[in-house]
Each structure stands twice: as C-alpha cells, then as structure tokens.
Amino acid sequence: MFVDQVKIYVKAGNGGDGMVAFRREKFVPNGGPAGGDGGKGADVVFVVDEGLRTLVDFRFKRIFKAEHGDHGMSKSMHGRGAEDLVVKVPQGTIVKDIDTGEIIADLVAHGQRAVIAKAGRGGRGNKRFATPANPAPELSENGEPGQERNVQLELKVLADVGLVGFPSVGKSTLLSVVSAARPKIAAYHFTTIVPNLGMVDAGDGRSFVMADLPGLIEGASQGVGLGHQFLRHIERTRVIVHVIDMSGSEGRVPYEDYMAINNELEQYNLRLMERPQIIVANKMDMPDAEENLKEFKTKIAEDIPVFPISAVTKTGLRELLLAIADKLETTPEFPLNEILEQEDEDTVLYKYVAEEPDFEITREPDGTFVLSGAKIERLFTMTNFERDASISRFARQLRAMGVDEALRKRGAKDGDIVRLLDYEFEFMD
C-alpha cells in the first residue's frame, strides 16, 4: 500500500519533578537542603531512513508519546533524563503543524534529524532555592510539560524528473524502457495510481531519477481525479517531461492536451511553470502521428524543442535522455512552499516572531475570570501546590507579572472566582 499523507499526534515527555529533601546525617547538624532536580523528558525526533518508501506504518500507529524524565531524589541526586523517541520516516517527508499551518521540517537526506516535539525540562529541587535569607527552603518545581502537537506528514517523492500528461499517453511505458522500474501498464485510464521511481542511465555516464506520476485530467488543481495526489509529488522535480499522445488515438487533440496540462500546473500555484519543460511526442509509430506533430509545432513557439519518440519501438530515446541530462545540469532545485531562497549557504535567516503576551484575561457569562497564556500556564503546571512555600511563590510570580492589577482593572473584587486551566481560586484584593 502506498500512503503519502497521514495525520498523527506527538507528545514529548514531561520533565521530572524536583524534590524537597534535607541532608540528615550523623554528626552533620543543619545539613541544609538536598533535594535533587528532575530529569529532562524525551524529545520526539524524526529521522530519515532511506529504506522506507511510504508512510504506511503511520496508518496503524498514529499516537507517539515519549517518556517522562525521572523525579529528583534526596542527597541532591538528579533524576535520569529520558531517551528521545526516534521515529523513522521516508525521504521527502514534510512535517506540518495542523493547528498553526507551520512547516516544522522538510526531511530529504538519509540520517537527517528534526525535533518535532520538544521535551520539558526537569523541575528544580529545593537545593536550588536556598538563599542567605532562606537557607532551608521547602519549595520545589514540578517538571515542565512536554510539547504536544497534531501534525500532518506529507510524502513528496524525490525525483529529478517528473513525467506528466493525460492518462494513457505512455508515461509508464516510457519509464519501463529507460529504467529497471516495472510500473503497472494496461489499456485503461489511471493504471498508475501511485508514483513509480526509476534510475535512468543517459548512456554517457550521467544518470538521474525519473518519476512516473499518476495521470492528470482537467480540474486536477481543484482535486478532480487524482488531483492533489499527483501535483504533490511533482513539487520536488527539477525538470518536467510533458508526454503527449501525438497519435490522437482516443480522439484527443495534442495541442489542446498540452495547454490543458500546463493550465493545471499553473493553477496549482507552486511555481511549477518556472521549471524547465521538455515536450515528448509519444506514439510516433501510430498512424496520423507525423501529421499531428507538424500541426502541433505550428502552434507552439519555434524555440521550444519537441522530441518525437515511440516508447513501444524504443526509437528517439537516446536523444531525449541526453537532453534531459543536459537540462538537469543547468537547473537548480526549487524551494517548496515559497520558502525564501538564500544566495549564500552561510547566511543566517532571522524570522520575526510576534511575542505573545504573558497572560490574557477573559470573562465568562457567570462572572468567572479566566486566565490564559503560554507563560502563565507553564508557571502554573510547574508549581507544586502540595507545598505552602510553592503556592506563596506562585502568588508572588503572578503579582510580579501584573496579573493582580490587571484583574482589578477588569473589575475583579474580593471573593470573585478566577480560573486558570482546571484550577479555580478566589481573588483577594
């Protein structure tokens, strides 16, 4: 089964909790705090494995949860950090955050790694909070929660050359005679429903990867037929080989087919028309092919080369393969998803990221004030509410952030209910 798109859930490990402990040894009076820090949780890491070809494994396992870090221990011993959860993906996988639309990683090289969900750090033990004013603190932190994400994986095949054209124009036959690939070939439309890759030897020592892609029909850019399944895989190709049935054996007009395919490529809006395109006039062994080719050439620009071939009789193939190899030598890779091209590989690209507010206040119909925000929620989850000292520290942190003052400005009075995540408390003015 060829699977090229799937949605999964990933959750990095939480950090271990810090510990409140004191050194208690004979002949060591007033030993002081000795609570260790919690260990770091495990990241969720994607690694490219060149042995994989599809995303089919993710159809049966869609939830990936990494391990948590161990809690801190007494005698100032830190908790053990968890080992990263390594998930193998095929070459050409793009990882996209479903909720934000952000492209997290584009994984193309064997062994390439990307952290998809970042683990939480371990909470600090009470030894970390010792000060001259408070040499024996009874507070610690909980571990930081690990990042969780809903992500979409898209597989876009890695090929130098993509064969495009209407169904049954001979794309699969062409790939089968110029490479060792054995795509399914039959006398009906959409025989090819998944991409087929083949390594092609140009005959002069040069070689390249060619992809036979599912046939295209009008409206594919809007998802008609195999639509986006086809166009997704052509995004990585550097050269497009446009195969046309020059015999018109199914009553089609070659020039109209040529224009229709190019229109779909342009409508997909991924700079596909900027890629070099080589026109292949296939089925030249059929009746009317020569006459149709002459008429076709009168309707296109004179500087556009057309390579007449017959994939069945294997004529005209050497000239075509050499032309493709020549074009590849002068064609750079095209960026995906409108990623900015960098002129210098050593250039560092800084992106502006809008800073989120520390907290936001909303009010529900029942009068409850609701606090939200990444920073304030993080402080809340890392607070150990079993210790009075930790609760007092959390209250001081809220006051320093300006939460108390902001609530007053929103009309909060003594005794009003304030909710943060699943926890409710009374506002004290």
From Swiss-Prot:
What are its E.C. numbers? Answer: 3.6.5.-
> InterPro entries recorded for this chain?
G_OBG, GTP-bd, GTP-bd_Obg/CgtA, GTP-bd_prot_GTP1/OBG_C_sf, GTP1-OBG_CS, GTP1_OBG_dom, GTP1_OBG_dom_sf, OBG_GTPase
Keyword check for Hydrolase? yes
Summarize where Mg(2+) binds, as residue positions: 172, 192
The family assignment reads: Belongs to the TRAFAC class OBG-HflX-like GTPase superfamily. OBG GTPase family.
- Summary of the function given for this chain in its UniProt record: An essential GTPase which binds GTP, GDP and possibly (p)ppGpp with moderate affinity, with high nucleotide exchange rates and a fairly low GTP hydrolysis rate. Plays a role in control of the cell cycle, stress response, ribosome biogenesis and in those bacteria that undergo differentiation, in morphogenesis control.
UniProt lists the gene as: obg
Q: Which residues bind GTP?
A: 165-172, 190-194, 212-215, 282-285, 310-312
Protein's recorded name: GTPase Obg
Which residue ranges does the record assign to the OBG-type G domain?
159-329
| GO cellular component terms listed in the entry, alphabetical order | cytoplasm
* Endpoints of the signal sequence: none
